[in-house]
């Protein structure tokens, strides 16, 4: 207990000059570290924000857009977005892996639309696979037509 009271009040052994000397380097170090941290944060285009997923390969914005189109009053929690994001990543990874196996089995080095369609059919059962294939084909046609229209302008 004696040490706590000695730490709380200034001791008689140290003078006010010694206290100032010991405090000055701390203040100098803190201002130097603040300047260094500001210099590190500022890049070429100023400070940048890092969102929850800095990698940029998240589907979170698309989930919210689709939900807004389908059910306007609803929202998604972060946990729900995280679960859905991992689900989509997993399915796309499985489709790519299966399409790669199909391309290797036909002795090709390029994954084409045919391998992708067959991978979707193999991975998704029954009607779900057929629906996914038709929706994927429609999406590809839609983007192709849009690209052609943009070239004509």
Swiss-Prot record:
The keyword Plastid does not apply. InterPro entries: Histone-fold, Histone_H2A/H2B/H3, Histone_H2B. Residues 11-36 have a biased composition (Polar residues). Its main location: nucleus. SMART domains: H2B. The keyword DNA-binding applies. Keywords: Chromosome, DNA-binding, Membrane, Nucleosome core, Nucleus, Telomere. It comes from the Eukaryota. Residues 1-54 are annotated as: Disordered. Testis-specific (at protein level). One of its GO terms (molecular function) is structural constituent of chromatin. CDD domains: HFD_H2B. One of its GO terms (cellular component) is nucleus. Residues 37-52 have a biased composition (Basic residues). It is found in: Nucleus membrane; Chromosome; Chromosome, Telomere. It holds the Pfam family Histone. In contrast to other H2B histones, it does not contain the conserved residue in C-terminus that is the target of monoubiquitination. Belongs to the histone H2B family. PANTHER family: HISTONE H2B. Atypical histone H2B that can form nucleosomes structurally and dynamically indistinguishable from those containing conventional H2B. Nucleosomes wrap and compact DNA into chromatin, limiting DNA accessibility to the cellular machineries which require DNA as a template. Histones thereby play a central role in transcription regulation, DNA repair, DNA replication and chromosomal stability. DNA accessibility is regulated via a complex set of post-translational modifications of histones, also called histone code, and nucleosome remodeling. Can replace the conventional histone H2B in the nucleosome. The nucleosome is a histone octamer containing two molecules each of H2A, H2B, H3 and H4 assembled in one H3-H4 heterotetramer and two H2A-H2B heterodimers. The octamer wraps approximately 147 bp of DNA. This is Histone H2B type W-T. It comes from Homo sapiens.
